[in-house]
Amino acid sequence: MWLLLAVFLLTLAYLFWPKTKHSGAKYPRSLPSLPLVGSLPFLPRRGQQHKNFFKLQEKYGPIYSFRLGSKTTVMIGHHQLAREVLLKKGKEFSGRPKVATLDILSDNQKGIAFADHGAHWQLHRKLALNAFALFKDGNLKLEKIINQEANVLCDFLATQHGEAIDLSEPLSLAVTNIISFICFNFSFKNEDPALKAIQNVNDGILEVLSKEVLLDIFPVLKIFPSKAMEKMKGYVQTRNELLNEILEKCQENFSSDSITNLLHILIQAKVNADNNNAGPDQDSKLLSSRHMLATIGDIFGAGVETTTSVIKWIVAYLLHHPSLKKRIQDDIDQIIGFNRTPAISDRNRLVLLEATIREVLRIRPVAPTLIPHKAVIDSSIGDLTIDKGTDVVVNLWALHHSEKEWQHPDLFMPERFLDPTGTQLISPSLSYLPFGAGPRSCVGEMLARQELFLFMSRLLQRFNLEIPDDGKLPSLEGHASLVLQIKPFKVKIEVRQAWKEAQAEGSTP
């Protein structure tokens, strides 16, 4: 027994003792570190981690490192360094670390979001981008699909006139149906049990990821039971069962003559690979049903919660700034009126609305810290050495709240994205990366930007979004997981009188 214990302790020491660094190399300044636990005792435990990491820059500078268990993580808090990692050396830092909870979510690093650098990630990212390219023109045009769901959402909200409601469920339905159409070419009905199941799965996954899981830091603990791991396995199993049912139906009815969604593109790539009619990057093994499910799961997971959260943040800030909301509605009334729906082509005309969206993405970034990158080779950031296998995290919160880059960064000021005349959109700082950048940038950025503009312009054209009668304003603090979520709140829905009058005139014989 003592021999086994000695072997176990020696193994732990080998795994968690700081590794020898390259002689003469200059590394980022590091937090203190202890054997086994690393820097864990020296990291702030209270408050939101992205803010804590930002605070640590005061002592350690815009790039510093710390150890969690056996892993070294480098934290980036300046846009020049972030752009070097994401763009200039994007390929060198395009890896993803293995994390216990995310390995379960991604079926051992399959799919796109959490997949490590390699042929499978490159292939599935390319196929996903090909799928979005399907929706540029014609009946499958992305704008048309978004407008269809925006119509359904607005028609539902019209039935809630005078009521104070939580927008989460109707928004989630609308955005889920947009993603569903891109992936499968069909939409869910509000009462569909599969829709509710998908929403529950997404909520459950985010709940697990919002909590610190020791197994993510100390993989050796996998020999012990973990409630978080069991929950994640259950959510992923439920999600995969739902998606696999759709996949099987799609495979049965598949025709190469009609490629209209992401799943069709994945199946066609599999058919081509099986028939030796594909490029060298399309290995059939990388297009198994499990790989397809992981990619579809990524698109659903990233596409629904992110857009839904940002729209709720925008509404919340407008409730806090009613005069801004009124100015945006005045612009919509003058430029669009009530006889047509807003279009993407109006984005450069409704500049105050677009500036408001951009400011919300700055002050409350979707992901306050980007998903960790990993150095796939020995590299550097600035004049500092970064060893192969080092995790690198860009603190987007730090970039978006730097006093050196943004005047009064904690104040909500959409005008910072407008020129002095207030008529032209501008890019006021390079310290702004709401969707990341480079090889690991968000594949759905174009979709998200269109959704945010079209949904908000439609909502403000038809409705007054008001503070509930109890006078309770939404909290602007947020709750960080993979996504910075706003705390639940209600908004009073009122159909605008000008909209009613315009509709009455339009229906008059």
Curated annotation (Swiss-Prot):
One term under GO cellular component: endoplasmic reticulum membrane
Compartment annotation: Endoplasmic reticulum membrane; Microsome membrane
Function: A cytochrome P450 monooxygenase involved in corticoid and androgen biosynthesis. Catalyzes 17-alpha hydroxylation of C21 steroids, which is common for both pathways. A second oxidative step, required only for androgen synthesis, involves an acyl-carbon cleavage. The 17-alpha hydroxy intermediates, as part of adrenal glucocorticoids biosynthesis pathway, are precursors of cortisol.
Known catalytic reactions: a C21-steroid + reduced [NADPH--hemoprotein reductase] + O2 = a 17alpha-hydroxy-C21-steroid + oxidized [NADPH--hemoprotein reductase] + H2O + H(+); progesterone + reduced [NADPH--hemoprotein reductase] + O2 = 17alpha-hydroxyprogesterone + oxidized [NADPH--hemoprotein reductase] + H2O + H(+); pregnenolone + reduced [NADPH--hemoprotein reductase] + O2 = 17alpha-hydroxypregnenolone + oxidized [NADPH--hemoprotein reductase] + H2O + H(+); 17alpha-hydroxyprogesterone + reduced [NADPH--hemoprotein reductase] + O2 = androst-4-ene-3,17-dione + acetate + oxidized [NADPH--hemoprotein reductase] + H2O + 2 H(+)
SUPFAM superfamilies, alphabetized: Cytochrome P450
Cofactor: heme
UniProt keyword terms in alphabetical order: Endoplasmic reticulum, Heme, Iron, Lipid metabolism, Lyase, Membrane, Metal-binding, Microsome, Monooxygenase, Oxidoreductase, Steroidogenesis
Family according to the record: Belongs to the cytochrome P450 family.
Protein's pathway: Steroid hormone biosynthesis; Steroid biosynthesis; glucocorticoid biosynthesis
Domain of life: Eukaryota
Pfam families: p450
Record carries keyword Zinc-finger: no
Gene3D superfamilies: Cytochrome P450
Molecular function terms, GO-annotated: heme binding; iron ion binding; lyase activity; steroid 17-alpha-monooxygenase activity
Protein name: Steroid 17-alpha-hydroxylase/17,20 lyase
EC number: 1.14.14.19, 1.14.14.32
Gene name for this UniProt entry: CYP17A1
